[in-house]
Amino acid sequence: MMQQDQAQRITVGTGEAAREIAVLREDGAPGRCGILWLSGFKSDMAGTKAEEIAAFARTTGRAVTRLDYSGHGLSGGDFEDGTISRWTEEAVAVFEAFCREPTIVVGSSMGGWIALL
């Protein structure tokens, strides 16, 4: 299970639009593709689906990266300020900062929509 002290932080946006995004990253075996998990609306990276994806990644030697969108879980910001555009910007920033290997993007519900954007 996820612990708050395990989460890394990344700042996305500038000025008043800046927000701190919580990220969990677990490295995998060299040569294996990784997984980026994108949660659904009002879900976070500690949810059942996110934990199952992380467990699958561990047992198959894959890296796994997951985040809490702003206003969700361990990330900063108010939920009411969230938009699909902001949450997409956060997902892209996390992908660019953390996903070093070829990566499969997996999303649930709203996270699936964001994965397609």
Where is each model-derived feature located?
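N-terminal cap/lid segment of alpha/beta-hydrolase-fold proteins
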Residues: 2-30
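Short beta-strand element of the alpha/beta-hydrolase
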Residues: 32-40
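The serine-hydrolase catalytic nucleophile loop
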Residues: 41-54
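Conserved alpha/beta-hydrolase
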Residues: 54-76
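Short, hydrophobic alpha-helix immediately C-terminal to the catalytic nucleophile
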Residues: 92, 116-117
